[in-house]
Amino acid sequence: MNPAHLLVLAAVCISLSGASSIAPQPLNLIQFGNMIQCTIPGSSPLLDYADYGCYCGRGGSGTPVDKLDRCCQAHDKCYTDAYRFYRCWPFLTLYSHTCSNRKVICRGNTTKCKAFVCNCDRVAANCFAKAPYNKRNYNNCK
C-alpha cells in the first residue's frame, strides 16, 4: 500500500474513533415538537421549552417551578419508564401520530416501545397546552 493510501486510511480511522464518542442526538424531538405545535398552535417548542424551569430541556433535578415544569418532570419520568419497562431509547424512537383539531392521536405504532414513547409525548403535549407559560421561568431553576 502506498503512503498516500495509508495516510487517508489513518485519517478515516481517527475520524471514526472521534465520532464514536459523540452522543447520539435525539431523533424524536422533532416529532415531540410537532405534537406541541398541534396542541399549542403558533408555539416554538425548541425555543420555548428547551430551558424552562428545572425539568424542561436536558436533564432535570430539584423542585419544579410551576405546572408547566411539572409536565416536563412527568415527561422525564415517562421516558425513564420507557427504558425500564421496554428497554427502548425514547430519544431515538420514531413513532407514528396524527394531529387534528389540536388533538394528537398515536396510531400505527408496531412495537410497545413506539406506542409507549408516543403516549409519553402525547400526554406531555396535552399537559403543556393546559399549563400557563411564565417567561420568568425560562432559564430559571429556583
UniProtKB/Swiss-Prot annotation:
Provide the E.C. number(s) assigned to this enzyme: 3.1.1.4
Disulfide partners: C38-C99, C54-C141, C56-C72, C71-C127, C78-C120, C88-C113, C106-C118
Recorded catalytic reaction(s): these are: a 1,2-diacyl-sn-glycero-3-phosphocholine + H2O = a 1-acyl-sn-glycero-3-phosphocholine + a fatty acid + H(+)
**Cofactor or coenzyme needed:** Ca(2+)
The GO cellular component terms are: extracellular region
The record's PROSITE patterns line, in alphabetical order, gives: PA2_ASP, PA2_HIS
Which Pfam families does this UniProt record tie to the protein?
A: Phospholip_A2_1
Biological process (GO) annotations held by this record are: arachidonate secretion; lipid catabolic process; phospholipid metabolic process
**According to its UniProt record, which residues of this chain constitute the active site?**
H75, D121
Where on the tree of life does the source sit, at the highest rank? Eukaryota
Question: Is this entry keyworded Signal?
Answer: yes
Q: What is written in the cofactor note of this entry?
A: Binds 1 Ca(2+) ion per subunit.
UniProt propeptide residues: 22-27
The residues that the entry says bind Ca(2+) are: Y55, G57, G59, D76
Task: Show the GO MF annotations.
Answer: calcium ion binding; calcium-dependent phospholipase A2 activity; phospholipid binding; toxin activity
> Which SUPFAM superfamilies does its entry note?
Phospholipase A2, PLA2
Coiled-coil portions: none
Could you list this entry's UniProt keywords, alphabetically sorted. Calcium, Disulfide bond, Hydrolase, Lipid degradation, Lipid metabolism, Metal-binding, Secreted, Signal, Toxin
Tissue expression profile of the protein: Expressed by the venom gland.
Q: State the family named in the UniProt similarity comment for this chain.
A: Belongs to the phospholipase A2 family. Group I subfamily.
* Record protein name field: Phospholipase A2 MALT0035C
Taxonomic lineage of this organism? Answer: Eukaryota, Metazoa, Chordata, Craniata, Vertebrata
